[in-house]
Amino acid sequence: MHGTGRAWFLFLANIIFINYILYYMKSMIKIAKSILPLLGLLLSLSLSAQDIAVKGHVKDHTGEPLIGANILIKGTSVGTISDVDGNFTLKAAVNDILSITCIGFKGQELTVTGSNTPLVITLQEDTEMLDEVVVIGYGQVKKGDVTGSLLTVKPDELNKGKQLTAEDALVGKVAGVNIVPGSGAPGSGGTIRIRMGASLSADNDPLIVIDGVPVSNASISSINPNDIASFTVLKDASVTAIYGSRASNGVIIITTKKGNTDGVSRPSFSYSANVTVGNVYKKLDVLSASEYREAFAKYANAPESFKLGNADTDWQDEIYRVAMGTDHNLSMTGALKNMPYRVSVGYTNQNGTLKNNNYQRLNASVGLSPKFFDKHLSVDINIKGSIENDKPVSTGIIGSAVGFDPTRPVYQDYEGNVGLGYYMWMDAGGPITLASSNPVSDLELADRQNKTKRSIGNIALDYKIHGFEDLRLNLNLGYDFLTEDNHDNMPELAPAMYTGNEQDGTGKRYMYHNDKRNTLLDFYANYVKDFKEHNINAMAGYGWQRFWYKNHDTTTDTKGENLTSPKHAEAELYLLSFYGRLNYSWKQRYMLTATLRADASSRFSPDTRWGYFPSVAAAWRVNDEAFLADNKVVSDLKLRLSYGQTGQQSIGSYYQHLSTYTASYDESRYLFGNKWHTTYRPNGYDPNIKWETTETYNIGIDYGFLNNRISGTIDYYWRNTRDLLNDIFVPAGSNFTNRIETNIGDMESKGLEIGVNLIPVRTKDWEWTFSGNFTWNTSKITKLNTIDNESNYVKTGNAGGTGRYLQVHMVGETPNTYYLLKQAYDENGQPLDGKYIAKDGSITSSEEDANKYVTGKSSKAPYYYGLSTRLSYKNWDLGINGHGSFGFYVYNYVSASNSFDALYGSNGVSSNILRSTLENKFTQDRQFTDHFLEKGNFFRIDNITVGHTFNKLWNDRTSLRLSFAVQNVCTLSGYSGLDPELYDGIDKNIYQRPRTFMLGVNLNF
């Protein structure tokens, strides 16, 4: 079946399934409508005489009235709320049970007796809110005892839109966390940065810990979002230092869903499904065929013999399509005696908006939590597996489609079946090898597939010692195994086989295999003891982790003959750790935390191998003081102060401190006599390379007002990173290569983070919640090398190709600051082609670095924010999520790479141009001018979701929810390109994220 036909078949099949459910519901509703009037009449006759007006007053333990307390007749939807004086009136029957609840207080139930005496109900403060535990490194801590900057996010099942990857659930949700979503390719992971990252070219990804297993900082797209119970984001050093050498960029702890722990043994099932339709809603503005012919005649420098074609082809329309997708998840949760369990499976099939792009994922997970020896031994077993089948496409196809001549056809036949029926550039000598290939042929002829198998699991033992139950011994054994098998094949005679390095039409088969093994062992003891008003929670442990990989790749022709030498690589890394933490609190009012971790990494030499990472933090629960005891406005107020050090050991090479050698490939061997000899090339190295060390100061406030109807956090931090790791050029002859990874400088960062949660409305039928966060971050490089001046900088921000660097790291500037030529303009504001303002103010045509200037503008966003709101009425709900950034800049490299020269190039082919080129009238590509540097400010409405829930369909356990959502609704921005939300700030060949419409079903039974 054709791909489009198959997609529509899947879509129709899902629609039929959903319609079946709706038909079943409709039948049930008809039956209910027939029966309910009769039941209502009987009930009214039997109960009307017993209905009485129940009056009451709700107050707290100090006698103050509670506003907005919910009073509900148990088992019904009949209820009311208390007024500003704490009073309420409700009609109820004798023996009805009233359920009284209020945020921040323990609920209470009362039976209606028929007495005329008004009820006086006193609700006690809910201390369990303080006793709620949050997950931290190597353990848990009471929420009220937290001294560091962390936030736990639980996925909102009613307001999440379409979440294909795990990081989608965090976008715009946490202050200080900036997530740039991946490209429009399905399954592409986003870039996560906590507090902008603490390094330059070393790894800036946060450490990801899944159920106690620190995983490699690769994409977490293999994790099923439906299996995730919570994310805990650790931001300051007091909570991240326990992870030592990998925590400079923050930590994200992912906890997956577990089995029932409430004693319910009967299994419960949950099924969710959705169908999606997506499309690109914005294309690059290029010339149509008729407009192109006019521009070509006016501006192209082509010989008279060169003729345009007769076609009218919109090449962007030819490569894009409507993308269909579906997602199914089924889970079973229950308990067998003392063993809670959860089993789940999930399947995702998502087409990309580029033709032939498809992503499929199969997930399965098993979680067991048995207890033995009178619950003294707790065992937690988690196994997660996934198989990903990705059919990727080259994003260069987008640029090729934008620039391909619109007067040329998509298909054309040539002698000898050259081109396999697709149009290609030809001259009298045959195919033009310097021309770009037909983008449609690349999409339809290429056979690309990336298959990834991954399993993450662990077994954690928690033994509470008999007779000394305050002491627990913990053992955690975990693994993260991954296998990749990729291939990229192109048949003989394909147009792509006549361009670039492939010039004779020979087919190509590229194969890549990669194995990764990450194993760990953690053993630690935990001592928890309450001494009247004093509480101690102490932990000490040992950790061992091994990282190993082995890969090889080959490139052959279609007959299996090697076109290049096979390449092999294998390496391993060890991490050895000792760590400890002490939490102390007095009256749950004054808290102190101290941690220390020592890490040894085999990445470094024995002289610099060990790193020591301490931290200390204190907190004060101000609202528990006597002077706030009678305050009815402040319900929570805690001050936090912390200091700590963390490290960075994630550099490019496993053996950067050693002198290593690489065997030459076949094409680089030497002939001595009659025999070819393999040579060995030395690699660059730095024997003195050492840890990057980051120290952070943090001051924070946790607040809550009006029974926590208003709550949130405020944090301010200052951070300094010493011995920055960066890849730099070195003087010729000083090392075996011209670039090495080494310690070159320091960087200072600071920021303000504000989070707020509001419940403006909460009544019997209505509830409106709102959450928002705002972040201000700034980073400045304070030391870069032994000599720091304007001429000493590190180039970065490569736009592609040799020497096309658009950004620099420089002392006194934000990382990734643009370093460009200052464009000259005429008196009408029109840019002068090839004219720039030199540093002395004169006009120059030279594009040398000496004429470039530090713009003071960076791709790093100093300000970003997120907004989320949900409105519910009875069983209806409406949710909206959005996020945005401002203060950063984007270089429109797509526009900078367009000029009149492209109309007819030196390679003898014609190319299309952007409409903006007619405005600036540049005759050549001007890829280093600040004319194309634009503000990237934007606000994106991520999703709008509306749903309806049907409770108690055929029993109390059964519910059904239908929802409709729009993902990537719109982006408000003044940027002229497709999308300003780019991690590196350089807009080139982007695969834009589609606008997606989703119909979803959730069934619980």
Q: Residue spans of the language-model regions?
A:
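Glycine-rich, aromatic-lined ligand/substrate-binding cores of catalytic
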Residues: 858-891
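Extracytoplasmic gating/loop element in the C-terminal half of outer-membrane beta-barrel translocons
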Residues: 316, 440, 601, 883-967
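Detector for glycine-centered tight turns/loop "hinges" at secondary-structure junctions
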Residues: 63, 86, 416, 429-430, ...
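Conserved small-residue
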Residues: 270-310, 655-656, 742, 761-859, ...
